[in-house]
Amino acid sequence: MQRIIQFFSQRATTLFFPMALILYDFAAYLTTDLIQPGIINVVRDFNADVSLAPASVSLYLAGGMALQWLLGPLSDRIGRRPVLIAGALIFTLACAATLLTTSMTQFLVARFVQGTSICFIATVGYVTVQEAFGQTKAIKLMAIITSIVLVAPVIGPLSGAALMHFVHWKVLFGIIAVMGLLALCGLLLAMPETVQRGAVPFSAVSVLRDFRNVFRNPIFLTGAATLSLSYIPMMSWVAVSPVILIDAGGMSTSQFAWAQVPVFGAVIVANMIVVRLVKDPTRPRFIWRAVPIQLSGLATLLLGNLLLPHVWLWSVLGTSLYAFGIGMIFPTLFRFTLFSNNLPKGTVSASLNMVILTVMAVSVEVGRWLWFHGGRLPFHLLAAVAGVIVVFTLATLLQRVRQHEAAELAAEK
């Protein structure tokens, strides 16, 4: 018995904490991906307008912005552990509450509360991983977490489409609530504490000062711009693709689910390449090799749909190529933005996520407007413009990171 206890205590941080975080993150993804094939059915069940379908995603993202300003500084002061555990509890209750919704408004409110899981996971959970492990190990562990979690967008639509042939869509949220409860138990048992509680008092003045310092940091600003813009091609596709492929394209929910597999599968493959084959994912040479892949995907989106229009081929192929390219470097960009400064990491992470989620929520609404008022090409043009700008912000980010590292080395000498 003592050996069993010793086994679990030794592996709590290195194994069971990442597993619990993965389950929490996986469940949060499923609230969108499992229901996306049936989101048109949800709208019809509540007798709402079909144009509200993408709002399920945009309000989820808005929920992800709601508490960022509080959770980062709070976790810097009272600890990462109590904040993340509270988030898992709120998420579980919000998923269970969806079972009781009777209108589209209630459903969207529940989606907003579910979206707060982004605040807790990204602001507190990912930072804990980065703090608990060294640079290369943390990057590779984040790549593993991302790969496993992104199975949700692959199997989520397929599973959701299959399950909705047998059960009501609300049952899916009941399943996710159970997953959230299991993640909550895992975090209670295994999550480490990586900050000293009470080292800095919590006050409005100190919080505002930390945020001011973050938003004055040039590396943070460049990294936040790079990361947020790089999300736009994929998030706009995730949000608007049900309308494009099911409502306008005539696809069945099963066909729609299969059409999403290449996009998220590309990110998973990219992350596995980083974990298994790349010795140092922070090398500029490796990072720049991913850029032509991203640009080829964006070119495919526009040229394919312009020259040989197809209901899904060029959209899926182009988005998949882009996803593969950005998936190879995303964990590294996150690490650069978070740790290339001496600022409180919870506040840095909160600031980063506020920027990313604001850009994502706005891009979803802009993408929806472009689709309904301009069609396929203007919609994909949004992704192309964002992807091209990323190349320039990435170059600036790498230059500033090199300057920061050189300054640190000089200071040590």
UniProtKB/Swiss-Prot annotation:
Keywords from the named record: Antibiotic resistance, Antiport, Cell inner membrane, Cell membrane, Membrane, Transmembrane, Transmembrane helix, Transport
Annotated compartments: Cell inner membrane
Chain segments annotated as transmembrane: 15-35, 52-72, 82-102, 107-127, 141-161, 171-191, 226-246, 255-275, 290-310, 311-331, 352-372, 377-397
Domain of life: Bacteria
CDD domains in the cross-refs: MFS_MdfA_MDR_like
An example molecular function term from Gene Ontology annotations: sodium:proton antiporter activity
Regulation: Efflux is inhibited by the ionophore carbonyl cyanide 3-chlorophenylhydrazone (CCCP). Activity is inhibited by extract of milk thistle seeds and reserpine, a synthetic plant alkaloid.
Intervals, Cytoplasmic compartment: 1-14, 73-81, 128-140, 192-225, 276-289, 332-351, 398-413
One GO term (biological process): xenobiotic detoxification by transmembrane export across the plasma membrane
Membrane topology: Multi-pass membrane protein
GO CC, one annotated term: plasma membrane
Pfam families: MFS_1
Ranges facing Periplasmic side: 36-51, 103-106, 162-170, 247-254, 373-376
Impact upon substituting residue 25 to A: Abolishes the transport activity. Retains the capacity to bind substrate, albeit at a lower level
Similarity comment: family membership: Belongs to the major facilitator superfamily.
Alphabetical list of NCBIfam families matching this protein: PRK15403.1 (NF011932)
Function recorded in the entry: Proton-dependent efflux pump. Confers resistance to a broad spectrum of chemically unrelated substrates. Confers resistance to various compounds belonging to different classes of antibiotics and dyes: the fluoroquinolone antibiotics ciprofloxacin, norfloxacin and levofloxacin, the aminoglycoside antibiotics kanamycin, streptomycin and gentamycin, the quinolone antibiotic nalidixic acid, the amphenicol antibiotic chloramphenicol, and the fluorescent dyes ethidium bromide and acriflavine. Does not confer resistance to benzalkonium chloride.
Protein name (database record): Multidrug resistance protein MdtM
Source species: Salmonella typhi
Lineage of producing organism: Bacteria, Pseudomonadati, Pseudomonadota, Gammaproteobacteria, Enterobacterales
